[in-house]
């Protein structure tokens, strides 16, 4: 398949710079995967789509204030974006600088540049940075002087309020450099209402890396290599999924990260061996993929030519997805991380759909 098959134009005016004031009052586009039928609702109407006995699964990762601004020894400015914490003193990160970054060079951060670090390695496209002579751990440093890493398409500086807006209300495990944005629409009253209705609620963890913002650079999408991210799916959750399906309930995934985590676990030994699934995954889901776990997906509106729109096409069907996006643009839905959402059911014919290239 050609990358250009997944191109469409989104007016800049539809890119959301801030979320809806009340999380659950964002708009919701509902698409039936089998019929392609579309309905326009508000997010709190999701309560009418999810039934007693269904299992809804969230990604409980928590966003790190992952962006640091500092200086080189020469005085030149640098911007560091955390990819992964390696240990108490070292990180894997991308570095922006006006000039070339050299190995074995120093970087300085914090008040009066008192926090000193040293570039000790390179693992394409990231640098390995070790923080020196600091009593504080890397986590402490980022929590104290880091900035919330808003996506590059939100053309404004991050504000203090983003520290809460760009987190889900159920965040727990610190480790992401981007929010699992489908979950941003859930507030505590909505979660309570789902629970009262008899919907089972559970969690897994996928720590989202900066690779989520990287474009596909191959004309043929099959040649794209996904970045790796750490996933944790408990054995208890796997057994709960099996029991839910056995009883006729549906599995609802909140976000593409949740779906990718579940599919990764499904293809592992953990699925049938009653073991926790804790591994890096680089699963790339695109049209032609047959989904094994999830019956319905809640997701935001994604960038054209992104791995995320390809996942949605694989789940909903290519034609259904393009029609839904056309309808969303026509009706002025808000796009991307702080935008509106979709609720889509699985189209079992999607894996066999022909996409003209």
From Swiss-Prot:
Transmembrane segments: none annotated. Coiled coil: none annotated. SUPFAM superfamilies: QueA-like. Keywords: Cytoplasm, Queuosine biosynthesis, S-adenosyl-L-methionine, Transferase. It holds the Pfam family Queuosine_synth. HAMAP family: QueA (MF_00113). One of its GO terms (molecular function) is S-adenosylmethionine:tRNA ribosyltransferase-isomerase activity. One of its GO terms (biological process) is queuosine biosynthetic process. It comes from the Bacteria. Monomer. Belongs to the QueA family. Its EC number is 2.4.99.17. GO terms for cellular component: cytoplasm. Gene3D superfamilies: QueA-like (3.40.1780.10). It is an enzyme of class 2 (transferase). The keyword Transferase applies. This is S-adenosylmethionine:tRNA ribosyltransferase-isomerase. Pathway: tRNA modification; tRNA-queuosine biosynthesis. Transfers and isomerizes the ribose moiety from AdoMet to the 7-aminomethyl group of 7-deazaguanine (preQ1-tRNA) to give epoxyqueuosine (oQ-tRNA). The lineage of its organism: Bacteria, Pseudomonadati, Pseudomonadota, Gammaproteobacteria, Enterobacterales.
